[in-house]
């Protein structure tokens, strides 16, 4: 779907009338769940996940058949400040690895039966170092939001967004601090593995960015423009597109959650179509999920990003949907109810 906006005002307008889950499908799924051949609540959280999914896809007896994993890659001006354990050229190299099928995300997509798309966002033009000025111009932000929006496949019945961009945990930390308050140190973690003096330097970069843009940080769209990156903006655009199309979303780790938090800040409830696939080992991720009111499905100590934790959760959701839709009711099975 072509993005319905050509300006930041147009993007904001998307949130004026967001679709809600289908009430009839929710009612039907809830009723069916109560009639299945199991004790009430015996499948635990799987039951709630299946009903949530049914409401968003508008089917009381749904199927999960076309999950899409959309990866976005962008480069950051702040990478030149030594905030990552890897050089900026790794972004381009990892995109090539995705296309060759050699990354972890490729293997996990195969297991999950998910299609995978990779969108490169001006990799030859890093964003501006946000300690020196806004990371993106308004036009650059609109273009990145639109790229994310248009990357979502119309036929997808589940979306996972992932990212590649050296320096993007720094941008995510700055966004989280700007949206939720607190010091740079509370939100800045090891990312790709920095520690000691390098971690102190990374934290200082976040603090300098927050100070530089302090007067504009009450506007979540400006937070994204000034402190974010193209791939974070594209993830936000894709998640917004999914809401408009009532496509359920599984959120990934810290970076993805920070991008999604911008939408939550624009309008509370904007992430009702999303669940948290996992809680990552990046230290501030639990705090972001708590602010978003999201309970993670998995806790596996993962911190790779790229959508990987969310992809692992796809088969958990698929299992939930399969039980709701495939199990017999007591009446169908001729089993006496307890």
Swiss-Prot record:
Pathway connected to this protein: Nucleoside biosynthesis; alpha-ribazole biosynthesis; alpha-ribazole from 5,6-dimethylbenzimidazole: step 1/2
Keyword terms of this UniProt record: Cobalamin biosynthesis, Glycosyltransferase, Transferase
The keyword Lyase is assigned to this record: no
GO-annotated molecular function: nicotinate-nucleotide-dimethylbenzimidazole phosphoribosyltransferase activity
Catalytic activity: 5,6-dimethylbenzimidazole + nicotinate beta-D-ribonucleotide = alpha-ribazole 5'-phosphate + nicotinate + H(+)
GO process annotations (BP): cobalamin biosynthetic process
The EC number(s) this enzyme carries: 2.4.2.21
Active site as annotated: 306 (proton acceptor)
Domain of life: Bacteria
SUPFAM superfamilies with a match to the protein in the record: Nicotinate mononucleotide:5,6-dimethylbenzimidazole phosphoribosyltransferase (CobT)
PANTHER family linked: NICOTINATE-NUCLEOTIDE--DIMETHYLBENZIMIDAZOLE PHOSPHORIBOSYLTRANSFERASE
Family: Belongs to the CobT family.
Function: Catalyzes the synthesis of alpha-ribazole-5'-phosphate from nicotinate mononucleotide (NAMN) and 5,6-dimethylbenzimidazole (DMB).
Name of the molecule in the record: Nicotinate-nucleotide--dimethylbenzimidazole phosphoribosyltransferase
């Amino acid at each position: 779907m072509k993005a319905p906006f050509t300006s930041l005002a147009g993007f904001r307008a998307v949130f004026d009338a967001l679709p809600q889950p289908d009430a009839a499908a929710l009612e039907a799924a809830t009723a069916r769940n109560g009639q299945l051949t199991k004790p009430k609540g015996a499948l635990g959280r799987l039951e709630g996940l299946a009903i949530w999914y049914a409401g968003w896809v508008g089917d009381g007896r749904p199927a999960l058949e076309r999950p899409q994993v959309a990866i976005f890659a962008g480069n950051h001006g702040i990478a030149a400040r030594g905030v990552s354990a890897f050089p900026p050229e790794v972004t381009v190299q990892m995109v090539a690895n995705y296309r060759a099928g050699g990354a972890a995300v490729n293997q996990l997509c195969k297991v999950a039966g998910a299609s995978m798309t990779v969108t490169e966002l001006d990799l030859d033009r890093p964003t501006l170092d946000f300690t020196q000025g806004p990371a993106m111009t308004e036009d650059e932000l609109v273009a990145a939001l639109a790229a994310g929006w248009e990357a979502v496949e119309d036929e997808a019945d589940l979306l996972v967004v992932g990212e590649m961009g050296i320096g993007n945990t720094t941008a995510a930390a700055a966004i989280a601090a700007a949206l939720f308050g607190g010091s740079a140190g509370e939100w800045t973690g090891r990312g790709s593995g920095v520690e000691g003096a390098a971690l102190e330097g990374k934290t200082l970069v976040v603090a300098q960015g927050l100070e530089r843009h302090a007067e504009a940080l009450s506007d979540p769209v400006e937070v994204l423009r000034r402190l974010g990156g193209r791939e974070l903006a594209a993830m936000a655009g894709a998640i917004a597109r999914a809401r408009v199309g009532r496509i359920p979303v599984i959120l990934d780790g810290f970076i993805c959650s920070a991008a999604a938090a911008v939408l939550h800040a624009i309008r509370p409830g904007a992430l009702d179509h999303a669940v948290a696939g996992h809680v990552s080992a990046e230290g501030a991720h639990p705090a972001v999920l708590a602010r978003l009111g999201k309970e993670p499905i998995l806790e596996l100590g993962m911190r790779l990003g790229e959508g990987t934790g969310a992809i692992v959760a796809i088969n958990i959701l698929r299992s939930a949907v399969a039980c709701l839709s495939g199990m017999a009711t007591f009446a169908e099975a001729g089993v006496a109810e307890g």
